[in-house]
Amino acid sequence: MYAIIKHSGKQYRVSQGDELKLDRFEAEVKSSVEVSEVLAVCDKELKVGAPFVAGAKVVLEVIAHGKDKKVVIYKKRRRKDSKLKRGFRRQFTRVRVVDIKA
């Protein structure tokens, strides 16, 4: 059984027991979060929502919060002695899929 969920404008295919990194959201570590924006559920047959499947929920357990590796953005304009170097670290929340209710 798997489900396709929408979170922070992105779509994820999840199964029970999967771990994934979502964009950071406010939740306590080891707490449960329910996602009701389920686009599709497959349990022997595929149910596709319009836009969401009615009554379907995915229960997530928050494992940890953290930051990704730094991404360096470097811009240089030739012959103008103009350059720009910036860094960015995306914050994420690591979650585990506990249950899929369809």
From Swiss-Prot:
GO MF: rRNA binding; structural constituent of ribosome
Chain segments annotated as coiled-coil in the UniProt record: none
UniProt key word RNA-binding: yes
PROSITE patterns xrefs: RIBOSOMAL_L21
Annotated family: Belongs to the bacterial ribosomal protein bL21 family.
HAMAP family: Ribosomal_bL21 (MF_01363)
Protein name: Large ribosomal subunit protein bL21
Organism name: Campylobacter lari (strain RM2100 / D67 / ATCC BAA-1060)
Gene encoding the protein: rplU
